[in-house]
Amino acid sequence: MDVIKRSGAVQEYDPQKITGAMRKAFASVDQACDEAALSGMLAQVERAIGDGVRTVEDIQDEVERALMAGGFYDAAKSYILYRQKRSELRAARLTLAGAVNAKGMEELLQGIQRDFPEEEYALTTLSGKFSGFLKAGMNRSEALSALVKAAVELTTQQAPKWEFIAARLLNFSFELELADELENRGIHSFYDKLRCLTDEGLYGAYILEHYTREEIDEAAGFICPERNELFTYAGLDLMLRRYVIQTHQRVPLETPQEMYLGIALHLAMEEKNDRLGWVRRFYDMLSRQEVTMATPTLSNARKPYHQLSSCFIDTVPDSLEGIYRSIDNFAQVSKFGGGMGLYFGKVRATGSSIRGFDGAAGGVIRWIKLVNDTAVAVDQLGMRQGAAAVYLDAWHKDLPEFLQLRTNNGDDRMKAHDIFPAVCYPDLFWRLAKENLDSPWHLMCPHEILTVKGYALEDYYGEEWERRYLDCVNDARISKRTVTVKDIVRLVLKSAVETGTPFTFNRDAVNRANPNGHRGIIYCSNLCTEIAQNMSPIESVSTEVVTEGGDTVVVTTTRPGEFVVCNLASLVLGNIPVEDDAYLHELVGTVVRALDNVIDLNFYPLPYAKITNRRYRSIGLGVSDHMLAKRGIMWESEEHLAFADRVFERINHAAIAASSALAAEKGSYDCFEGSDWQTGEYFTKRGYDSDEWKALAGTVAKQGIRNAYLLAVAPTSSTSILSGTTAGLDPVMNRFFLEEKKGVMLPRVAPELSPATYWYYKNAHVIDQSWSVRACGVRQRHIDQAQSMNLYITNDFTMRQVLRLYVLAWECGVKTIYYVRSKSLEVEECESCAS
């Protein structure tokens, strides 16, 4: 006997489907039914329908009669209601498919119905919402947009999975429009698309120069379209608006999966062995949303101008030529979408001498205002204005004015509202802040110290810095601007509460943990406070007039110094089985290799950046995560601290092992000899004394390490949205909130929000911040660079409470603090470091 399905298709009769349906009917009313009764009812149904061809509806009618005849009235009622509900769902599905009238729409809706069977995600609900947006005469695109909007607006704290349904609908709409565009262009394969994009100057020619057509075709087979279902609506919407390749008329020509594959092709193109194998591994880690690369890498890999790095750090020299060179460096970096950290601690203070003339110097503020204007003038690829953090030491004579750069009161000629101030603190400052706020604090000019004492105070740290600082304080030849620690603390906290800044850089903690202290010092961090690498200023050597080819040219020679570059990626811990050590090591090994490849494949906006990046081969592997909530761990708990300690130790072990293996294959970074990696001090300082760690230390000493710096936790504000996770190390601001985008309110839901995870998501502003600080201290032991850690405060906080958090952070060994986020304060996120 054959059965005609509702679609019109014919299939062979299967009695198991009938008995299965009856079992479900009995189970739904908690009623038992023995096999004999089931067999009897099945026989009754089969006698009634006889041989030949029957419809599904005919058979289901007979099942109802058999249940009633057997006296199973409750089960029969449940079965009837089930049929009615299924009928309503079919009607809703057909209504929606008919309104859109696109091939594949009904299959998409069937998939949604299958994957989201819960009552709150019924297609009848979607159809009801959609009917409110439906208008006569809508075309296909308009109807799909209305359907997406309906799903978005159904997203609530109680029904969060609508954001995944909305994403599927958005992707369907996008792929329909893309298919029309590709058809018009005659593009029928991935290779055709790469050829077309390359010809239009949208794709780097180097991809097709490195891979044969056969390799491109094989790589195209790696694409898994079903991984689009991992996107939330917010993530996919952001991906399509900002990251996939678009024509000059802003028409997208690349799918998210093709974007991931294009990045993988770029990052693997110089691999000598198993190149396509690495393409696949890079593609898999990205498309499974286990790893996110930094925004510049996601945006620019595979493109002609492949600037892949996030942030840059420059040491501003104390000379007119050097200051303007640093400002020009910032302009060049900003032009290609990078953010900047600028250390102004060497620049002479207001009233200092110039060429022996006392009182001639105007101080750092006027130069910082030039940085501010450059940030506004040189926007990031026309998308947003440039961004720079400027760092100044806590003992610099211009510090009080510096701390008022962004505040709302005072002389506007001394303001720079578009840059982000940051202060570099020695241990002595926090020790005095803890013990006696009325202690004197002496502010001095670095140029005056260098002139009188013959050394730069900022070139030292720890006990040696403190000894020299007191030596300067006691030297009557050096002028001082003496205030109390309380005066500085008051200015810092006032600015922090009003503006979220200054950022905090604990210079002694940073430099004590620097594995490359044998080669220099770390003066400051970057725009997002997660990078800590050796720095030194660019120096002018000579300027000569020479003749070349009959032309007179001016040749300026410079010594490149150490111009820091950040190459970032993040592990999405909520999407990774972190308890599986083998899996974690393999994944970390893959992303470390990808980041190391970035160094060689990068387009550098400045030669200084290229020189430093290839000298140290520094990378910054970080995390973004909803790992704790997913595992049922409360933020404010010792379990949190213990779990973070274990996980970050394993990540660190995996990263070091991977980098050392790369060194065995490709060689160590240039400055390995004499480093803490080579001497073993890196492991001793962190108390890594288990047999496993001792073995790894021995391996590193023997075969080297590829990357001078390995771990740095960036804020990941944008890329965390792509991967549907929480940003960086932060707790959630709210479990559910509405965000306005282009006049539309978009719902945002905490990742994997459910009754099981609900109570593990606590609003960042009501969390006891001491737990966040302590957790940061626990993680810091395993992170050789720093972490973008925010403090969240409310209007109820007193200044003394905020100060206690700063002091606690210093006591816990926290290297940097990013924003102080007041509940009423909006701060600007760094897009570049969104890894």
Give a label for each model feature:
Residues 6-13, 100, 251-254, 273, ...:
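Alpha-helix capping and helix-loop boundary segments enriched in small/acidic/polar residues
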Residues 9, 31-261, 277-283:
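Core nucleic-acid recognition elements
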Residues 14-32, 105-119, 261-268, 727-732:
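Short, surface-exposed, low-complexity cationic segments
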Residues 78-79, 83-86, 162-194, 425, ...:
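Terminal amphipathic helices with adjacent charged low-complexity linkers/tails
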Residues 212-220, 224, 228-237, 529-533, ...:
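Catalytic alpha/beta core of large soluble enzyme barrels
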Residues 245, 251, 263-275, 279, ...:
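Function-dense linear segments that define catalytic or interfacial modules
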Residues 285, 303, 587-608, 633-716, ...:
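Internal maturation/activation junctions in enzymes
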Residues 404, 419-492, 496-499:
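Polar, glycine-rich mid-to-C-terminal structural blocks
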